[in-house]
Amino acid sequence: MTKDMTTGSSLKIILLFSIPVLLGNLFQQFYNMVDTIIVGRYLGEDALAAVGSTGCIMFLVLGFATGIAQGFGVMISHAFGAKDFRLLKHYVALSLILTVIVSAILTIPTVAASRLFLVWMHTPDNILSMADAYIKVIFAGIILTMLYNVSAGILRGIGDSKTPLYFLIFSSILNVVLDLLFIVVVKAGTAGAAYATIIAQGISAILCFIHMFRQFEILRTTKADYYLDRPGVINMLSIGIPMALNYSITAIGTMILQSAVNVFGSSVVASFTAASKVNNIATQTMPTLGTAMATYCGQNLGAGKYDRIFDGMRKGFFICIAAAAIGAAICIFGGEFIVSWFVSNPSDEIFSYAMMYLKTVSWFFLPLAMIFLYRNALQGLGEGLVPMLSGVIELVCRFVAIALLQKPLGYHGICLADPAAWVGAGIPLMITYIIWKNKKIRQHSSSPA
């Protein structure tokens, strides 16, 4: 069902919206976990390192696609908050048209150049072919990944965070079955794990769209809604492109980090891969909060309810504190246990490198949480430039940290790169929101009663 986030308790609305999103994010991690666990246990440590070494490149490309899709969802929330249902239907149709165009533009060059990307990142020779086999399949399925994210973004834009979860649960179960089929039975190697993922995502997307058009009359498009108009395309892309570039800029920084890790060999790559999975699990409340705040701020901006935006952001700050504390506890006290999920018979060396990373980054989870709060809120408010520039600052900080710390501190210096990037990116986001808030307060106080 739809949810109007422009009325009622802001804290309750944000939390209730966030719960299904959190579960969805966890199942999204479950996709990746299943791939990693089955690859590590049935194909070995080298195959695990191969899949892990593709993570940054995948984030670069799929992150761009995801950012575009999330931008479409923001415009949906604006139209829904303003109760302009004619525009809402056109935005739904336009989202589908632009999804097909963007996915076609992304798929062809990435499939063709995947091996070259891996070579540029200094992927070890012993895992290069396995990594390329995996990532080629993932890139070939970009349209399926985009369609799921667009369908979820549309539904979340109208306040429905439950429906995407239901189809994702089904798809996650299917992903497990397909992983075992392609890897254990068919013996398709690392490519089998990729086939399982994109097929499961594609089925989830198709089912989600079928249900969406049947269940929600306000989203049910007609032939008349499907057209490319300059204002509509500009509105959609003016939000979507900065969000997409922000993902990609962040991914470039992560690629620099992964490239630095690759220099230390496949054992360290496997350790870093497993530790990154733990980190992703521990911090899932943070992107969840960000998704909720983008929709909440977008709907209330469309309705012109600025006081509710201010109140929701105050509540969001305290949620950040709780999310950071919970994430740090998971990494510090449960890190070794979760690492063992991803590596068969992990050595002391694997545990040592993985925990060094987790213990280092967990102390900086509050700045990370605040990035998600302020970046997504600003994007929901239509302020896409500074969030994108904060990604550039994040990239620069990560690069400088690696350049300065890798030689004197070795792997530990690499571990400090993420915290440096989070602190550097968070400060301008917070300042920009404060400036935006004060501007709206002045405009409100100077307007006639």
Indicate where each model-derived feature is located.
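Residue-level signal for short hydrophobic patches within transmembrane helices
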Residues: 7, 11-30, 34, 57, ...
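Short alpha-helical transmembrane segments in multi-pass integral membrane proteins
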Residues: 1-18, 76-141, 185-241, 297-364, ...
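Small-residue hotspots at the loop-to-helix junctions and early N-terminal turns
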Residues: 43-56, 131, 135, 194, ...
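Small-residue-rich hydrophobic transmembrane alpha-helices
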Residues: 48-108, 145-164, 271-335, 368-390
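Transmembrane helical elements of multi-pass membrane transporters/channels
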Residues: 16-35, 137, 148, 171, ...
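Short runs within selected transmembrane alpha-helices of multi-pass transporters and secretion channels
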Residues: 69, 137-156, 164-172, 193-208, ...
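Helix-terminus/linker motif at the lipid-water interface of multi-pass membrane proteins
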Residues: 26, 30-48, 118-125, 181-188, ...
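Transmembrane alpha-helix boundary and packing residues in multipass membrane permease domains
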Residues: 21, 25, 37, 74, ...
